[in-house]
Structures are given as C-alpha cells and as structure tokens.
Amino acid sequence: MVIIMEKPWVEKYRPKTLDDIVGQDEIVKRLKKYVEKKSMPHLLFSGPPGVGKCLTGDTKVIVNGEIREIGEVIEEISNGKFGVTLTNNLKVLGIDEDGKIREFDVQYVYKDKTNTLIKIKTKMGRELKVTTYHPLLINHKNGEIKWEKAENLKVGDKLATPRYILFNESDYNEELAEWLGYFIGDGHADKESNKITFTNGDEKLRKRFAELTEKLFKDAKIKERIHKDRTPDIYVNSKEAVEFIDKLGLRGKKADKVRIPKEIMRSDALRAFLRAYFDCDGGIEKHSIVLSTASKEMAEDLVYALLRFGIIAKLREKVNKNNNKVYYHIVISNSSNLRTFLDNIGFSQERKLKKLLEIIKDENPNLDVITIDKEKIRYIRDRLKVKLTRDIEKDNWSYNKCRKITQELLKEIYYRLEELKEIEKALEENILIDWDEVAERRKEIAEKTGIRSDRILEYIRGKRKPSLKNYIKIANTLGKNIEKIIDAMRIFAKKYSSYAEIGKMLNMWNSSIKIYLESNTQEIEKLEEIRKTELKLVKEILNDEKLIDSIGYVLFLASNEIYWDEIVEIEQLNGEFTIYDLHVPRYHNFIGGNLPTILHNTTAALCLARDLFGENWRDNFLELNASVSKDTPILVKIDGKVKRTTFEELDKIYFETNDENEMYKKVDNLEVLTVDENFRVRWRKVSTIIRHKVDKILRIKFEGGYIELTGNHSIMMLDENGLVAKKASDIKVGDCFLSFVANIEGEKDRLDLKEFEPKDITSRVKIINDFDIDEDTAWMLGLYVAEGAVGFKGKTSGQVIYTLGSHEHDLINKLNDIVDKKGFSKYENFTGSGFDRKRLSAKQIRILNTQLARFVEENFYDGNGRRARNKRIPDIIFELKENLRVEFLKGLADGDSSGNWREVVRISSKSDNLLIDTVWLARISGIESSIFENEARLIWKGGMKWKKSNLLPAEPIIKMIKKLENKINGNWRYILRHQLYEGKKRVSKDKIKQILEMVNVEKLSDKEKEVYDLLKKLSKTELYALVVKEIEIIDYNDFVYDVSVPNNEMFFAGNVPILLHNSDERGIDVIRTKVKDFARTKPIGDVPFKIIFLDESDALTADAQNALRRTMEKYSDVCRFILSCLTGDAKITLPDEREIKIEDFIKMFEERKLKHVLNRNGEDLVLAGVKFNSKIVNHKVYRLVLESGREIEATGDHKFLTRDGWKEVYELKEDDEVLVYPALEGVGFEVDERRIIGLNEFYEFLTNYEIKLGYKPLGKAKSYKELITRDKEKILSRVLELSDKYSKSEIRRKIEEEFGIKISLTTIKNLINGKIDGFALKYVRKIKELGWDEITYDDEKAGIFARLLGFIIGDGHLSKSKEGRILITATINELEGIKKDLEKLGIKASNIIEKDIEHKLDGREIKGKTSFIYINNKAFYLLLNFWGVEIGNKTINGYNIPKWIKYGNKFVKREFLRGLFGADGTKPYIKKYNINGIKLGIRVENISKDKTLEFFEEVKKMLEEFEVESYIKVSKIDNKNLTELIVKANNKNYLKYLSRISYAYEKDNFARLVGEYLRIKEAYKDIILKEIAENALKEADGEKSLRELARKYNVPVDFIINQLKGKDIGLPRNFMTFEEFLKEKVVDGKYVSERIIKKECIGYRDVYDITCHKDPSFIANGFVSHNCNYPSKIIPPIQSRCAVFRFSPLKKEDIAKKLKEIAEKEGLNLTESGLEAIIYVSEGDMRKAINVLQTAAALSDVIDDEIVYKVSSRARPEEVKKMMELALDGKFMEARDLLYKLMVEWGMSGEDILNQMFREINSLDIDERKKVELADAIGETDFRIVEGANERIQLSALLAKMALMGR
C-alpha cells in the first residue's frame, strides 16, 4: 500500500506549547519565566521594544518648503494611524554624502509610542527631544564624525547643523513684508478699533513706516505724534491694515505670539522683513547683534530665516527679573556671520550700521570650529608622503581654515594620486624582453645599438649578462621603453616607499635595492622582481580602503555645509510620549528641530508587512536572497532523468502559482552538478528551490560565456586555502571563475520509443520500441541536429530527412550504411538550393519511419516549431554512456561545423538553446567547450588562447607553492616564470604536477603536507579557470532563483557552466514562511508575546543568515531577542594574562588585532563578539561583589561557574559561591608596534662578534675570505659596477688592486650573480626566517622572549662552545614549561637530562639530582648575547637587563620579572596566616659585585612600576657576596607582587593561590570587618550584651571591645587559616570558590559578550564567565538580533513517547523493534526520527525494524557488530561476505558502514587497547575514502587489519 504524503510530519507534529517540548527542561524553565513576567513582546526583536528612531510631535521640520511641526504633518497623512503610512508628495531638506544641503523625497511616515526620551541642549540654543536610539550626526572629541545613538551622546560632543537652508520660492510683496517687519517690531493694533500705532525713536524709520502705510493701505489716515514724556509714534487709522493684521492673529497684545508668516519665509521678501524687524528690535551688544523677543516661536523662526542667508544664530533664554518672564535672545556672533548679515540684510539706521562695521573687525574663530580626526590626516600624510602645515597638530580648526587647508590638501592628494596612476601604468609592463626575438634580429640590434654581435650572442645564450644600459638599448630597438619603467621605479622608491620597505618584501638588503635601481646593474631579473613588488605596493596604495576613507573625510571637510554645535546638557525624560519619523530612502536624514538640526530617519527595520507597501515592498526587500536570473541554463536530474533546462522552466515544474508570496518550494527529486572535496564534479540532491523578485541584476561576461545574477550572489573562486565564495558585487574584471570539463557517467544505450508507436500497425510498418544506440546511431542522431528535418503526411506517415551536400560523399555513404544496418526503409533524392532550384546541389536521405519521426519531433525541438532555430539536444542524450555522447557530438560537428575534430571545432547555429546544450553536453563528456558569437567551440588543442581546461588561477597556486618553497628541490620559479614575471593570470595543471614532483614530501610539516595535498588535488581537478571580461548592471524586474544543496553549498549554472554558491533551505524555511506567518497573527490570551526557536542556527549559510536578518528587520515592530552579557568595564584575560576591557576587546576583535582569550580550556579562539543595551532584552544588570573584593556587572541571565555548574545571576544570592581563577592583573593590552629586535643594531653586534672570531676589516684582511660581512658588501657593490665593462679576470684584477685583497674567480662569479656569504648575514637571515624580526612589543612572543630571558639570567648559562650551546638548569616541571615556550619561538631543545650531584653549600655536603636541558641554536645564542647575557660565568661577568626590556612596556617587564623570580626567587609559603617572604638572591664574585648591585637597582625600579616595594641586602658567604632583593614584608605589598607579577613556570600556580588568600584576608579586614564594626558600634547602646553582638556578627567578644575602645581592627582568631583555605576553598587545584557578599541591581546598561570555540567560557575580572548562548557560526547581524537556544540530543524515552503519540494519531502499528530501530538511526534528533517514521509509513502500516533499516539505508547494529566480531575472530572471508551484503543488498555507502562500525566499538568484547587501535584504523580508512579511494577495497583492508589485530 502506498500512502499519499501530505504536509511533512515534522511540521505537523511540531510542539505547540512549552509543555510539548520534550527533553529540554532547562530551556523550558527559562522560557516559562518570560511567560510568568509577560514582559517580552511579540517575536524576535531587532531593536528596542516599541521604540523607533523617532522625534516628539512638536519637533519642527521643513516640509515642502515650509516649517511645520512633524506631528501635525504625520497626523494629516496617517489620519491618526500608528505605524507606517506611505506618502509620495512630501519633500524635506537633508544632507548628502558630501555634507551638502539637498531636497529629498519622503517614502513613508511613521508614528509610535515610547516611555523614554533623551532631551538635548546645545551651545547655540538648540533643544531636541528624541528616542534613546535616534542617531544624530556627531563630531566627537577625538575628531571622528559618525551617526551616534542619542543615549550614547556625551556633553562636549558637537551636533551637525546646517549652515543654510532652502525654501521653495513664493511671491510676496516686498514692501508689505517690510511694513510687517516694522509692525511686529514696534507696532500695535488696537483690539477694539481700527487704530495702529508704530512707536520708534528713529525719525527715518517712522517716516519709512508712514510711506509704506500710505502706499499699501488706501483707506489709511496717518499722523505723526511727538510726545514730551515718551517715544514719538506714527498713528494710523485703517480698516484694511487692521483686517490684514487680524488675519495674522496679531491684533491686541502680540509680544508672545508673533511669528514669521510662512509666505514671507519662502519668498525673496524675507530680506526686507528681517531688515525692518532688526531695525526695530535688534541692537549691537559687545561683539554681537542681539534681538530679543517674548515669542519662542518667533525666536526659532528667526534662526531658520537667518539660515536662508547662511547666517548662524544662537538662541538664548533669559528671565526678566522685573516681571519674571522668559525672553528669547537671538545672538549673531563671529565676524564671518556678521559680515554675511551686513551683506544680505543689514541695518537702515546709520548708528547701528556704524557699530556693526566696528565689531566685524573682531574675529573670534573659537565660535565656529570642528574637531579634526588627526589620525586620518596623518594617514594620508604617511601613505602619500604629503607635506602638511603645523596646523595638523591642532585639535580644532575654524570652518574657514578647515576649508582652506583641506582644499589645498586635496590638490596635493589629487596630484599624487595621478602620479601614482601614471607609475602604476608604467609598472604594469614587465621589464623582461623576448630573447628569441633578439636572436632573430641580432644583426639589426647590433647595428642600431653599437653592441658587438658576438656580445649579444653571449647575452642570448646566458653566458654573459648585459648591463642595464645595454639592456635598455636592446629593449628600445625592440620597441620596449624600459627607461620609462625604471624611472617610474626610482620615483616610487624615493617618493612613496623606501629601499628598506622594498628590500624587506624581497628579503634583500636596502643597499642591494639601491644598487639595482641606481647603478648600471646586470641583475635584470632582480629589477623585474622589484618592479613587481613596487607594482604591488602602488596597487595597495591606490586600493587602500583606509586611505580612500581618509581622503573621503578630507573631501567632506573641504565641501561640507555643516555647523558643529556643541552639546551642553543631556537629560532623560520618562513618561508616555507619542513619537514620529520620516523615511528618506538612501540618505536617511532630514533637517528639523526647534533650531535646524540634521536628524536621522527610520530604516527598513521599521517597515511593516508587504501588504502595507503594495507595489513598493521591494524597495525594502530588494536582496532577500542571492539569486540568478530566470533564463540561466542549468543541467539537472529530475526523478533520475537528466535535463538541460533553465530556472524559468523549473519554476513551471515546481511552483504552483506566480504569486510573489510563494517564495520557496521543498523538493526531493531534483539534483544538480557540484564539486566534492576532491574537486571532482558530482551529482548532489537539492532540498529547496527559492525565488523572489528584483529590479536590477548584474551581467558578468567571461571567456566563452556570461552569467546573470544578483549582486549579493556568491561565485566560487580559488584562493590559497581552497574554494571560497565571493559576492558578485565584489568581482572585478580579471578575476577568475571556475568551470569544469569532466567525464560524468551515463548508463543509457537504449531508447524506449513505445509511446511513439503508430496506432494502425501493418506488416509494412517497422516497430522499434527498444531502439539500441551504438556509436553509429549516436553519430546519426548528432548529424540530425545539424542537417536533419522531420516531415509528416497526414497523421501516420512520418519521415526523418537528412539533407547533405552532394559533394559530402563520406557523410552520405556513412549515413546510408547506418540506415541499412538498422533495417530502416529509406528514400533518396536530389534537391535544389534555396537560390537556384534547378541546380541539384544537395542530396536528401529520407528514413521512412513514423515512430522515429515522432520521437525526433517530440525531443529535438523546443516546442515552438520545427525550424533550425527551434532545435535542441534531447535530454535523453545527456544520459547516454560517455562514448555515445562523444559520437553524437561528432555527428553534430560533421554535419555543421568548421575545423578539425580533436583540435578545434566550430559549430554554428541559429538556436541559442542548441549552442548551450552543445556546450553542456561536451563538458560532461570530457571535451572543453565555449560559446562565441553564435557558435559553440569544441576545443582539444590550440595553446592558452584556445584551450583553457588545463588552466587554474596562477596567484593562489603561487601562494601555495611559496609555502613549500624550502622543500622544493629545483628551480620552480623558472617553471612559472611567465606567471611570476610576465603577469600571466593562469597556470597549467601540468606545471603544478611538474613542481610537485620536485617536492621533498618526507620533510614536509603537517601544515605543509596540507598545502601539498591541496595542490595535488588541484593538479588532478576537473575544474579550470575562465577570466572575467566585463561587468554591467541591467534592468530586470522579474523573479530570480536559487537552489539549496545541503552539506555542499555549490552548484554549476550558466550558458557556460560556472561554479556558484547556493543558499540553505533551513534558513529559507525560517525566513520566508514561519517568521512571516507567525508575525501576522496576534498572541492568544493575555500573554503579550510569542517565541520562535531558531534551532541549529550554526548550520545556516551566510546568505541565509543575511536573509533572516532582513526578514527580522521587516517585522521588527513585533520582534524581540534574548542575550546575556557583561558590562563594558569587565576586564577579560588574554592567554598571556594581559587584561582588556571587554568593550575594547570586541573593537580589536572586529579589527582582527585580537582573536584569543583565556578560559577553562586555556587559550581559546573567539568566534564572535556582540554589544547591545540590556534594555533591548529586558534584562537588568546586577553587580556582584565577592569576599575578595572582586566585582563584576552582568545581566540577570548571564551565567557564572560554581561548584555545582553554571548558574544564572538571577539564581545567585548573597552567601552563594562562584568560582574565581586568580589571573594576573594590572597589565593591560596596548597596541605597541615597536620591534623588540633592531636588525641594524644586531648587525652591528654581529660585525663586532666577527672581529672577535678573527674576521678583519678592509686594510687588515689579506683575502676576501677574511673580510667581515660589511666589507664583503662593499666588494659586491663594486663588482656589480664593473661587471658591465670588464671580464671576470679584469674585475678580479681591479678588485685586488683597489682593495688590496686576494679574491678568486669563483668568488667574482658568485658576486656577479648577487651571491654573498658572511657570518653576520647568515644569522640576520636566520632571525628573519624564524620571523623574530617581526615580533613587536604587543606580541605574545615578546612576552615569551622576556620570560625566557629572565629565567636564563637566573638559571641559564651560555657556554663558550663554537656551536653556541645554552644550558638551563631547573626542576623537571620548570623545564617542561620552558620547552613549550621555546617551541612557540621555533626553538628545539634537548630532552630533559637528570644527573646525580654532590657539592658543598655553606659548609654542608649536599647530595641529590639535578635536571637540565641544552639548546644548540646559534641564532638564539647570539641574540641572548646581543641582549647582554654574558658568555661563561655570570657571577664573574655580572648581570644586565637588556635595553628593550628596560624601555619596554609593562607586559615585557612583568614577564622578565616572572622569569627571573621563577629561576632565583624564593617560593612563597604561608603557615596559618603569615607569609614567609619573597626575595631574589644571587651569589657573585667581588669583581662583579657592583655590576650586580646595579642590576638589582634596575629590578627594584621595575618592581616599583607595579607598586611593589623592595630593598637590597648584601652579605658575605664563603668569600662570595650574597646579594638579595627582598620584597617588603606586609600583606598588601605581597598581594601586589603575587597578583601583578607572580612567577614563571612551576612556582606560579601555588603563588596565585597564596595571593588569592591574601586578597580575601585583606578584603575581610577592609570591607567586611569594617562594616561589622560600624554596625556593632551602632547597636552597642546597652540594650544588647557584647556577647549577643559577637554571636550575631560571628566575631570574638574582644573584637567588639577593641572597637568600643577605638583600637585598630585586628583579624579575628576564627578567620580561616591558609591550610583551611586550601582544603575548603580551592577547586581542581587552580580555582577558588568565593562567597558573594553583595548583590545589587543597577538597571539597564550597555553590555557585551563573546563566543569561544572550544569551551563556552572566558575569564572576566577573575570570574569564570559563560559566553554567548548563540552558536559560534552566526554572523554578527544575527547575533545582535536573534534568540538562540542550544538544544541537546534528546533522551531515548523522550523520542519514544513522541513517536508513539504520532503513530497512534496516524493509525500505525509501531512495533517495539521498529521503535528501537528509529531511536538508533535518529541519534537523538527528533526531526530525523519523525521523518524516518513518515518514510516507513509510506511503505507499510506496520513499522518494524526491518522496514526502518531499509528506508534509512542503515544496517541492523547486530549485523555490523557481527561483521566486526567475525573479522576480529580471524574469519576474514565471512566478514567480507557480510560487508558485500551490506553494500550490495542494503545499498549502504562505505561512509555509512564506517559510522556504524564506530558506534559499535564500545559494545565489542575486546580490551581497551584494541578498542583504541580499532578507532584509529576506522579513522584512517575514513580519511582514505574521503580522499577518493575505492570504498570496497578500503573496507576489506580494514576487516583484514582487524583479523590480524584479533590474533
């Protein structure tokens, strides 16, 4: 019985309530807390709950050219509705990317509510009320300019405001505006009558007012009145004037309600209005123009109005003491502002005008300044070598100075960029010339250059190298301008780089680079290397993102129109507020506020569901998923049948509608081509097809084809680590795509034509239901595609017609033979050409078979007709065996192509589909093919120009080979000379194989072996490279598609197949359907939220995660997420025990400067870091204080480690205990890029060392061999100069004459070739090889060097042996730690050696054992000596602290001290309460006493940097001086030493525990006892006895008595001893369990967290802290948006319960054996179990173990176990037969069998050792199978090995 499958049961039986979730008690418990609190709103939230980035309703904004309140505008548009409302007729002002003011369209408006606002006040009088998350453009104190959330703003930050604003122009009577200005300033309209008075003491103004009144109002009666005791006025009686005033609402008392009419604000008449108003109410005070008004609205209007003219005004509030009223003062300051006022508005009064001119002279630049990001300016200076003025050192620049400096700087930048582009252009051309061409033109070149012909022949044969001058002459003759290239190289080296930088990259000396560039060198190959290096450096500069960003910053400074207004006050407001916002696409800002301010708008995170947006939904959902266009060709298998199709055709097959909501479709019968781990092309199953619509796509053209896809779709490319995905938008011309040529297996050699059988069958009709295909018939079908047609007479008589040229005798004969052989009836005739019917130029062969004709008609055409342009290659052909496919192509080529088979064949066609079919068919048949201009090409030969299938991208291959460089026996660079020196972008696989044969495989390290294996796979891969030629954006507006290939993420598609990256079906499932559907439904009951589980989210691909993020943004009004984190002040510990605040760590982690932390696992890799505000997740922050005084702040759901496991802060109470790791403190991580080894100084040291060894300088040496290295370099330089003019013998003679030394011809030859040896050079090179020259002070290795150095000074010895042996004597544990440190530096030490010893100490005989190691590493030996470690007896020669330690950072000083005290310091010890002391002791001879004292003084100073006090003591013992440095004896001093420095190696762990005991002891005295004492004193009032108080506080009675007497607090006798501490408090020997003495809630805070790789923990403030709850592979945007719960595998009983429930509901008989089998194969995965059950139910109602194992392709565990037991019993043949049964009858893969064998190991009755051997053997077999070995052979070999093992 077959059951028709409905909805997948995984979805049908998904848990509906928290109680339905089985086996996850901890998670359910946590989620139920949220239900109880009802505090978590709807869904997964990607922003603060219920709050957008919004403003209050009274915020002013310029919309459509007028100033209005934002609330009023949005209420009109939305009709009071909350949420999003679309609009298309609203315009606002904002700034573009250059900081210029522009007008933008608003896409939608937004209304919401919030409980919290931030109120901001600025120096210029601005006042804003915004939500906490509203971003504002800020100029920070460090000069950085960025959008900052309001809650993060600080007083002193500067807010971006516009320098001018624009209004839509409107007409207004200028004289009426002027008259109104006068009236508002000094006029009054009577409330009851038609009287108006204008009161002003200036006669000129009164006269002007009267003139304007008479002109504007015809009924006006005007009279001037001069009063004795008050100011004169103009009296007006005019009904018209009063009606005009009444309309403006200004009749009667008007002082606090005046405003600038909007019509005037938008018109040119504004100028006249302002002049009149300022004439009346404006004045000059000190250095400013000031105007006072009682109307706040008028004051704010004036600021906006003045900005129309670029005048920046300040608004200031003042309370009038006489009437206690608030007045608003408009203040215009700064000479540039005042001058703008004068030029655009001015005064009419002479008196005010004169004062204005006077104050304009006084410049005050401090009012209009910007804080400069000096780092960006300096970066430009350093990168482009630009000279800057001293102003760069100033933090603040005035606006005018800023524009002037940056505009000048831009000119210099542009000049240098142009010069660099010219240099780049010159360096693009290689220096090397074609010596074959030189050979051909030798005679001509000799004549033109004057170089002897025989000399040129020597150059050609390589017997002599030409000098640069001669080389240039030859190159010029060949038309190659080498001189231009050399000049460019010299300019770049001197101007933009340095000889040192270039030399370092090429591993050459600075002087060598100078010689090659400046001299007449013969080393042309070296010049070519320099050219390539310089070209790389030029490109790095021109493509430097940081430089581009910095130049953009300068461009912004030079062109912006922003005034930076300093914030002076920030206040949080609580209550219920309605908030509003506008959405401006692309620029996301607009100008608004009480005074004009640049504000940010909402982003797509505040969009509602698609139905609200209608046709505009895609504006915010453009890149929902990365996809390819609908007509992209792809080869697929559907139900096992191969089909060359397009995504558009797949859409028709799988999608039911054209509805955009139907975005994905799960499939189980679809396969695509992809690549496996060995880079072999394979079929893989598709789980999901995805589609969505986009407006635009990219078209990328490459060699032989093109692909169309969205910009965020990734294409697979090759880099040095293998295959990587790169976004299409990041692809550049010249990049290499990957295609394939492979032999894909095919099985068919027969066609089933039964469906085409004629209805009326007679004896004359040949029936061919089973049509066998051999090579002949395959060729015949291929020929049909080229030359065939089909015809029918009526419905039954069909013919297959071949038309061939009458001259094509071979084809005609071959076709006739095949037709005859197959027994077909045929008919032949001649036919005319299309131009001349009479000329019978072609012959037709007609196969008379209706069945064959119907088959051809149905399969060889696209369904749109039977013309040539409709032809296709039938899908069945793609399934034929490989040899048959090749013959089909041969037939196609013979009929319609040019060229030669097995060389290059061109096949022309009018059918694009046919050409694409041909290319795909050829490629799966092992033939390279491409498409060019209406033809398909099949390619076997023709060099790189034609044949590409043997080529791979050169750059990653070269990088891989360089990693093996030291293990290659031969000149691999010569093999790849074209790629290295001529810029060839690809390399052949044959050359890779050739180089691999030269590799010494046995000497490869593990990492090198990985590279070698990768290269080996690539040398055999079926992939090859195609170069990108062109990229363009095209309009599209249609569906795009993607497929999900589980566990592979790749597929081939395109008209020429290209390897693409795919999506992930789980992410799509969550994104497209569940989130959308879930978000649209309301919560049931009174619970205000729902929860989504994002299970196994670490399996999501980056594409799927990005799509999830976008969907979350889309529904962000109903989303929330859960995280648990620490506040930013928490200090986390790095592996080398430096501290760093967690917020700083995350910044450095993002910059990839720090990647590891210390946790329970030791050193662990950080995979993710996140920051957010704890209010987002509704978790308040708590402060925990421990008995040691340690503190930490964390969210309530953050976990800390306790004796009983992890516990949330919510669960922890006072007196509970948490575990602490006593990490060192006091040394923070700081970036310090100084090098610890100065190579120049080291070289100088080596030179002096050479002299000690007997080498001599020039003047003293008799031969070249005796010379010091430095003088050998001088000889080299001179030899290179002479090499162009003289023979080797002549050079030798001249060198001997000039330098007075003997030198051999062999040495001369080596020097000419640039080869130089020397002691100093050898060890400098060794230092470089080990990478020690790159070590900086902030590198962990700097600490290792310092630690070792300290220990070696104490207990090490540099012997006087030639090989440079170092001896270190210590305990075995110490030596093991030292060896680990040495290994990290690349130094190998001997095994640990133990010896018996006997010696006398202080007159006593001592016997025992000593242990030591020795190190034979001359480079390390010399480096130690260079750093001051004496060779021989240190006690005689004395001790030194190296300069790099002395002047280093605290990190290297601490490590040096740890090493020194670890060697010679006393181990701290406590008995009961008291420590025995810490000191450093060294016995020295009298001769080195003073030097040792100096050394100890320096150590003492170093200790003082850690606030550790010490003193020095010297005493005589046995004629030696015991010099001791003693740490002062007090607990606080000891604690500082033990917690900040401690010891290296063995003494360290115990010392930390001593330190933690002291910390608890001191905290008890300083914190706990102090509090007890204060409380006891308060209560000691006679009511309670002293004994009662002592019992209450658990202290002795005498402690209370001492407090009453005022004595110092002592430690009570009942305080734990150190022995008790070790027993009761120490856990696992390294953690301390400490009591929480205080827990307090401190509200919401910004919090941080990190995710580690190996262990979910990290050390923070000493606490062992749990890391993020979400998985390690989630991208940061998801981490910051998503609630992720980690589900553990379910228990058997949990799965069984659920399966029984489902079986009962579905009417299935689930047997016990069937249940056990499902549990076994599902491995704790409920979804897998349900899927197996549903699959089994499709075959039978009775589900037993047999059917379960059959549908899951798994063997019974007892079968596998039996096979293993047979093998172990030595019954190999029986075991092998059972293996074959599993593989053949059960259809199991080798990998599945191995997995089951691995699971059965524990159940075998064999000893532990054999189990280990067996696990190792299974692992080895698995590796070999993965590498491509035959499964059956490998598994048989494994059974054979087990048979031998069993003996």
UniProtKB/Swiss-Prot annotation:
It holds the Pfam family HTH_3. Keywords: ATP-binding, Autocatalytic cleavage, DNA replication, Nucleotide-binding, Protein splicing, Repeat. GO terms for molecular function: ATP binding; DNA binding; endonuclease activity. InterPro entries: Cro/C1-type_HTH (IPR001387), DNA_pol3_clamp-load_cplx_C (IPR008921), DNA_Rep/Repair_Clamp_Loader (IPR050238), Hint_dom_C (IPR003586), Hint_dom_N (IPR003587), Hint_dom_sf (IPR036844), Homing_endonucl (IPR027434), INTEIN (IPR006142). One of its GO terms (biological process) is DNA-templated DNA replication. Residues 179-311, 780-927, 1348-1508 form the DOD-type homing endonuclease domain. Signal peptide: none annotated. PROSITE patterns: INTEIN_C_TER, INTEIN_ENDONUCLEASE, INTEIN_N_TER. Part of the RFC clamp loader complex which loads the PCNA sliding clamp onto DNA. Heteromultimer composed of small subunits (RfcS) and large subunits (RfcL). The intein interrupts the potential ATP-binding site. This is Replication factor C small subunit. The lineage of its organism: Archaea, Methanobacteriati, Methanobacteriota, Methanomada group, Methanococci.
